[in-house]
Every structure is written in C-alpha cells, then in structure tokens.
C-alpha cells in the first residue's frame, strides 16, 4: 500500500508520517528531508535554497520527479511532502491532507527552528506563496484544491498520537476491492 501525507509547513506531516510508517512497518520517504538535504549540500538556509529554487525550476522538478517515480515503482511506503498526493496521483492507495491554522503552524515551526513565531510566520507565508506559484506554473496544480485527498485532518484539534490514530483507522478500513478507483487528478502536467 502507498499512503501519502501532504499539507503545508508546520501541519505535522513529518511527525504523523514517521509514526504511521513505524506502525505499519513501512518505509517513510520525506520530500522535505530531501529538499533540506539539498540545501545543506549547498551550505544554504532553507529560505536561501527556496529563493534559488524560484530561479532554477529544475530543483523542484528533480525532487518532484523522484517523488513520482517512487510512487510509481514502490509499495509499502509512506510518502510525505507538500505535493506527495499530487505527485503520487493515481499510484497512491490513500492520500491524506493535514493542516492547521497559520498561527498554530507558525508556533510549531518557531519551536522547531528556534526562532520567533513572527519570524516563522513571515518566512512560512513567503515560502507558501512562492511554492504555490511554482506549482501552478510548473504543473498546473491548484494547491488550494484538496478534493484529491481521501481524508483531511485539522491537526490543531488533536495531538500527534490522536491524528496518527485517525489516519491509521482510515488505512485499516481501506479495502482495495471496494475502492471505486483512484481519485482522478486531471489537467496536471507531469513534465519534469
């Protein structure tokens, strides 16, 4: 089974995906870890690398191609990134969307990255705007359209363990033979 976990920064994607993968004994593949690793390889901050990605479309496209190829060729994985649901597309068995209000996400990011909530919020808003524009430009993806997801969870309402339990319940209840087919993802340009 291929499960995707998507959502904006600070929504709890990595936490839930890691715990879910452990529970299922699946491999956890994180697009964010790959992206951060590429930034570190160049001795750039995440903000600096994101700016570079704005100028060099191939950075995003290489990462997204890897996600799509992973989804096409692998099983028993939890694939986690902002675009995991979109890139996995028809190959995903279950696509999960996690979200929380910006104030909650900014606080989480501030705690994780040892910065003020105001700084985290400003950086996150700029990053989201930049990435949303790039997704539209490169792939014709409307990032605000969450209808491609099978389950959406507001992670501000429950703690990480409870969110993981909600997702596990959905995964456990999934029966491929009763599935009416993959959620159609139309008009996306998978050109890398």
Curated annotation (Swiss-Prot):
GO terms for cellular component: cytoplasm. ATP binds at residues 7-15. Its EC number is 2.7.4.25. It is found in: Cytoplasm. Disulfide bonds: none annotated. It comes from the Archaea. Keywords: ATP-binding, Cytoplasm, Kinase, Nucleotide-binding, Transferase. GO terms for molecular function: ATP binding; CMP kinase activity; dCMP kinase activity. One of its GO terms (biological process) is pyrimidine nucleotide metabolic process. It catalyses: CMP + ATP = CDP + ADP; dCMP + ATP = dCDP + ADP. Belongs to the cytidylate kinase family. Type 2 subfamily. NCBIfam families: cyt_kin_arch (TIGR02173). This is Cytidylate kinase. It comes from Halobacterium salinarum (strain ATCC 700922 / JCM 11081 / NRC-1) (Halobacterium halobium). The gene is cmk.
């Amino acid at each position: 089974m291929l499960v995707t976990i998507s959502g904006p920064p600070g929504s709890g994607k990595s936490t839930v995906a890691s715990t879910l993968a452990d529970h299922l004994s699946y491999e956890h593949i994180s697009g964010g870890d790959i992206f951060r690793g590429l930034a570190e390889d160049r001795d750039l901050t995440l903000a600096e690398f994101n700016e570079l990605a704005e100028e060099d479309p191939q950075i995003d496209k290489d990462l997204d191609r890897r996600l799509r190829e992973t989804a096409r060729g692998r099983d028993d994985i939890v694939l986690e990134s902002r675009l995991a649901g979109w890139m996995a597309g028809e190959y995903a068995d279950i696509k999960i969307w996690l979200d929380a209000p910006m104030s909650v996400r900014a606080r989480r990011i501030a705690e994780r990255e040892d910065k003020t909530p105001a700084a985290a919020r400003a950086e996150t808003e700029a990053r989201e705007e930049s990435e949303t524009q790039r997704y539209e430009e490169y792939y014709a993806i409307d990032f605000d359209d969450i209808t491609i997801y099978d389950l959406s969870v507001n992670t501000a309402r429950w703690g990480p363990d409870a969110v993981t339990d909600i997702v596990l319940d959905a995964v456990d209840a999934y029966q491929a033979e009763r599935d009416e087919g993959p959620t159609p993802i139309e008009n996306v340009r998978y050109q890398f």
